[in-house]
């Protein structure tokens, strides 16, 4: 997810029927995301404000909240024997990079569970997955810095300057430090943490965010653990490393060759298999726990992130022009049938509510239904603070129109983020 100014014949007939929009929006849920960093000043040390605003959220018409309890630093806001507790939140503070201290000792997640349930809300824990540190000028914070041996867990990226650089020491970017999803130690750490959450008293669900490769896109994932896993997948050492010989890849500008295709497929297989393990681990602890994932709706370019969030039944090569190269092996990495629900970020400018294509909220939701093929309920919605036309507020009247439009196509509504409701005083909106 993005924060920006706040601190993703008979069988055919059955398939088409599964992908048709519902004729009624009655009873469809409405999810609200509560980002940890962006809302820390309001709730990090104030349980009374949590209780007050859960009531206000319910009054707006939301049915579910997703409480981010593991920001990109990798510290956590719940009781854990696995992950370090968050004692201070890094970010932009008073005109420079710094920290906001957490001085309270109440259980942040439990406070939201208690207050949310009292207000009639279902409460889900949002978890940033493939991250474990935070870096800015003068700041190196989080578990990969507290325990330097864990820097070997980080993604290694092929930068534009032609260098392979560990994300923990990369100074080109500010913010979260990404971990390599192919690293077995990373996976086991995250699975153990999810098991703790699955045992949390009263928690209704878990939503994974950033369960993907890092923002260097196709140039991400070149750690030693990644190389070993890819070699195992190939059954031989890769003839090129990095696989893409020209750094700075943003989009595919040609049909990938055999090794490049295998690399793109490998990364999606890593994420697919991790999601399967995560779902199993959570449901072993609590079979009734809802287990979901957030993804961006812009699937036409999602190969960049190493995630295939579609149904494995969905014929990518024939249905998606930007995936004409996709093999049956790539199609099989579709993960939609592994989760209980999906949050789909239909992030667009405020002017792009209606339409049938990507880059419109309605189109994103419509295409989401087509791509998921009935495998999983999905809840779609906008970022109402960072996209063009939203960044200065003043869109209170538009929000119910967006919600009604999206709920005609999706199984429910999702909105990012509570910080924008607070910033622009949208509390009087009613859905």
Q: What is the predicted function of each stretch?
A:
Residues 324-431:
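Substrate-binding cleft of secreted/luminal carbohydrate-active enzymes
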Residues 77-90, 131-170, 210-250, 304-316:
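Aromatic- and acidic-residue-enriched segments that line the glycan-binding/catalytic groove
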Residues 27-47, 125-200, 249-260, 311-314, ...:
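Active-site-adjacent "subsite" loops/lids of carbohydrate-active enzymes
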Residues 62-73, 108-169, 207-210, 287-292:
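Glycine-rich, aromatic-flanked loop segments that form ligand/cofactor-binding clefts
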Residues 132-135, 139-140, 216, 285, ...:
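Substrate-binding cleft/loops of secretory-pathway carbohydrate-active enzymes
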């Amino acid at each position: 997810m993005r924060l920006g100014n706040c601190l993703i014949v008979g069988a055919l007939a059955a398939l088409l029927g599964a992908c048709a929009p519902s004729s009624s929006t009655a009873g469809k849920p409405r999810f609200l995301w509560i980002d940890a960093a962006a809302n820390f000043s309001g709730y990090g040390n104030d349980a009374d404000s949590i209780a007050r605003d859960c009531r206000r959220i319910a009054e707006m018409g939301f049915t579910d909240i997703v409480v981010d309890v593991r920001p990109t630093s990798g510290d956590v806001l719940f009781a854990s024997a696995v992950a370090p507790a968050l004692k201070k939140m890094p970010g932009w503070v008073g005109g420079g990079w710094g920290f906001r201290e957490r001085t309270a000792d109440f259980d942040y997640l439990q406070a939201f569970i208690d207050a949310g349930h009292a207000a009639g809300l279902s409460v889900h824990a949002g978890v940033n997955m493939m991250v474990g540190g935070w870096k800015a000028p003068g700041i190196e914070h989080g578990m990969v810095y507290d325990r330097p041996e864990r820097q070997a867990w980080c993604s290694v990226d092929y930068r534009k300057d032609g260098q392979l650089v560990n994300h923990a020491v990369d100074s080109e970017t500010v913010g979260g430090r990404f971990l390599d999803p192919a690293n077995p130690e990373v996976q086991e750490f995250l699975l153990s943490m999810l098991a703790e959450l699955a045992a949390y008293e009263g928690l209704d669900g878990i939503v994974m965010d950033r369960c993907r490769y890092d923002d260097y896109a196709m140039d991400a994932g070149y750690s030693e653990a990644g190389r070993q896993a890819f070699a195992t997948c190939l059954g031989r050492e890769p003839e090129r490393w990095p696989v893409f010989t020209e750094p700075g890849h943003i989009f595919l500008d040609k049909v990938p060759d055999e090794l490049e295709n295998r690399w793109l497929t490998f990364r999606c297989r890593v994420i697919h298999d991790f999601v399967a393990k995560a779902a199993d681990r959570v449901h072993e602890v609590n079979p009734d726990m809802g287990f979901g994932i957030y993804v961006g709706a812009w699937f036409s370019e999602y190969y960049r992130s190493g995630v295939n969030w579609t149904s494995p039944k969905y014929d990518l090569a024939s249905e998606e022009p930007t995936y004409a190269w996709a093999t049956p092996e790539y199609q099989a990495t579709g993960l939609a049938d592994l989760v209980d629900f999906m949050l789909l970020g239909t992030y667009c400018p405020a002017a792009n509510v209606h339409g049938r294509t990507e880059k419109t909220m309605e189109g994103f939701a419509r295409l989401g239904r087509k791509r998921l093929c009935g495998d999983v309920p999905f809840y779609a919605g906008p970022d109402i603070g960072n996209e063009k036309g939203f960044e200065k507020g003043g869109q209170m009247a538009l929000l119910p129109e967006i919600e009604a439009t999206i709920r005609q196509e999706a199984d429910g509504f999702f909105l990012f983020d509570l910080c924008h409701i607070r910033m622009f005083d949208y509390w009087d909106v009613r859905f």
